[in-house]
Structures are given as C-alpha cells and as structure tokens.
Regions:
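Active-site mouth of glycoside hydrolases
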Residues: 24-220, 224-232
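Charged helix-capping and loop-helix junction motifs
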Residues: 182-183, 235-236, 271-277
Length: 373
C-alpha cells in the first residue's frame, strides 16, 4: 500500500484523558467526552518474544495502519517462565509473589514505547494456562489469594500509565475454580487502579458476559467468535445477545478469525483471508460493537524461523505485518471518524422481508442523518 493510506501522527491523543464508558452504555470515550474507537491488534507474545528494536518496528507499523490498541500478555502462553526477549526470567523461582524486576522493567518499556505513539496496551496479567492449564504450557500457579496480591501489585505499578486497558482471562472459561481466581485478580487490580477500563478474554465461541456481566469490575464485554465459524450466526449467538443485556455494557469481538490461520485449525480447509477480516469487522461494528480486534496467525505468536510454529504459522511475523487484512482497518477507522457511530444503531429493518444469506449476511447501521450498509 502506498504512503497515502498511512496514518499521520500518533494513533490517538492520550491528552484527552482516561477512557470510560459513555452515558449510553454502548461505546467508549475519553474523559473529555470525545468518542474512542477500540481498533485492536493481537500480539500475545509481543512482550515475551520481541526485543526493543523489534518492538519499535512492530508498534510503528501498527501506528501507520490506524490501530489504537495492542493486545498482549505479561505471563504468556508459549514460553517458559524463565525465558524472555531480554534474557530475564518473568518470575523469580516461578513464584507469582516474586515478579522479576528485569522482566517487568521490560514490560514498563513496552508500555512506554506504545504511549509515545499514542497506542493503548490492552494488557493481560497472565494467559489462561497459568490458571487452567488445558493445552497451554502452564504451570498452574494461581489461587484466589495470590491472584489478588498479584493484581494489587500490578494495579499499584501501572495505575498511572496513560495508555492501559486491562484484560482478565486469556482464552479460558470463567467456570468452576477459574471463577474465583479471575474475580480475585480483577478485584486486586481495581482495588488500587481506578483509572483504567477492564474486560475479560474468554475461550472460543464464548463471551465475558457468560460469567461476569454483572461484575462491578467488568466495564465492557468481549467475545471470541474464534477460528471455526464462517457466517453471521456466531454474532447472533454472542454479540447480539450481549447488546440486549441489562445493565447496558459496550461489547466487541476481541478474537475473530485470524488472517492466515487454517479454517477450524485444519490446513485442508484452507486459510482465512482478508475478506474474512472485512466480514467480521463490518458485521460486528454495524451491529453496534464498540470496537474490533484484528489478528494474524503469524503475528500473535511472533513466529520466526527457529521457533516452533503454532496453528501452522508459515511466515515470519515481520513479513506478515503488511497483509491486506491489516490495511483494511484504517479504511474502517476513517469511516468511523467521518460518521458519529455513538449516535447510530443497527438498521436491519431496511432489508424488510428479503431473505438474507448467512455467510454474506448484510448489516446496516446509521441514524436519520446517515446509513451505512
């Protein structure tokens, strides 16, 4: 893409104040009342795997493409607790009550590098495998008690960061023993950090609302439509019900199908492409979502030669940053900046009784002044 498409200047204007939910309970805004668009990229392994120079390269690429938020993790899924990009362990002796100073200085730097570009960091304190191992590396290290202490420590450390959004969870449910741990982690952070929004990242084809809609710490809902479904039915199951829940909370798809990931994780099915990005982006936003997160299979894991590929990753992350799907977001952002989405709503009634095909399901959005289809 030519330079004409690139965003000029910082990703956002952090001087507009902390983020909050607007009065409608549907959208996000700065404390000065200016609407905020959550336009996320998925970089789960950013902190663990990229050094300072690589981090700068990645963040600058995302600023140019109009992203406003980078989703990443402190205690990640793929690498051991004693492995990180700066050679420091993440925890001393694997003890959650002993965060390693060197690693957290690196976390600080990533947040600061992003802030300098006006990018928010949507930060997961841990991936879900440290709470509920299942298919991750683990180990399970959390109890409700130490999760609260870790959360409070994080809240004290980052409460004044100008560019932070908290994400609890990490591809896991809130059921069973998990519920008390996630709740304690969130409550620990919020016990000291009153400045930042918080949501929850669930496992595939689920929403944070399934367990935490009424939790005082959950400011907005996040669903994961996941990497198997290919039509609008998944939003009819997840996003549309969330929009109807009381009390109203903003909602969004925080993990739709990734560009270049095998469909349903099977190579013989082919891979999701840029058209899938546009489908999920416009279908969710025109339904009334407050934001959207893009993902690329090679970037979430920061795949490179010499690293074990997950989900059949096949291209180094730095060669994957300019895929068409990533460029598509800046066009939506310009549309969003032209029309006041906070004053619009879904307008499906314009289709009348026309039979609608589910895979290419048309969605309309607007108000008396504009209509987008």
């Amino acid at each position: 893409a030519s330079d004409v498409y690139k965003r000029q200047g910082n990703a956002t204007n952090l001087s507009k104040g902390n983020l909050r939910v607007n009065s409608s309970g549907r959208y996000l805004e700065y404390s000065d009342g200016t609407p905020f668009l959550y336009m996320g990229d998925t970089a789960w392994e950013l902190i663990s795997r990229l050094n300072d120079k690589e981090t700068e390269l990645y963040l600058e690429n995302r600023r140019e493409k109009g992203f406003t938020v980078i989703q990443t993790v402190i205690l990640d899924e793929l690498d051991d607790m004693d492995v990180s990009s700066n050679g420091e362990p993440k925890l001393i002796d694997g003890n959650i009550d002993k965060p390693a100073p060197g690693y957290f200085t690196h976390v600080d730097k990533v947040i600061s590098l992003a802030a300098a570009k006006g990018l928010y960091i949507a930060l997961l304190p841990t991936w879900g495998d440290k709470v509920d191992k299942q298919w991750g590396k683990g180990p399970e290290i959390f109890t409700p008690e130490n999760a609260y202490r870790y959360g409070k420590w994080l809240g004290e450390r980052y409460m004044n960061a100008p560019n932070l959004i908290w994400i609890i969870g990490g591809d896991r449910s809130g059921d069973g023993k998990n519920f008390a741990i996630w709740n304690a982690l969130a409550t620990g952070i919020k016990s000291v950090d009153k400045n930042h929004l918080m949501t929850y990242h669930p496992h595939g084809e689920h929403s944070s609302s399934f367990w935490f809609h009424n939790a005082s710490w959950l400011d907005f809902n996040m669903c994961q439509s996941g990497h198997a479904q290919q039509d609008f039915a998944i939003y009819q199951r997840l996003l549309l019900p969330d929009l109807k829940k009381e009390p109203h909370k903003p909602c969004m798809d925080g993990e739709p199908r990734y560009e270049n990931i095998p469909i349903n994780f099977k190579k013989e099915n082919g891979r999701f492409g840029d058209d899938d990005i546009r489908h999920t982006l416009y279908q969710s936003m025109f339904s009334g979502a407050c934001g959207y997160t893009y993902g690329c299979n090679d970037i979430w894991q920061m795949f490179d030669t010499g690293r074990e590929p997950k989900c059949d990753a096949d291209t180094p992350w730095y060669q994957s940053m300019d895929k068409q799907g990533a460029w598509d977001l800046i066009h939506f952002r310009r549309l969003w900046e032209k029309f006041d989405f906070t004053q619009g709503k879904n307008q499906q009634t314009i289709f009348g009784n026309i039979p609608l095909e589910n895979k290419n399901y048309p969605v309309a959005f607007g108000n008396k002044d504009y209509l987008l289809v």
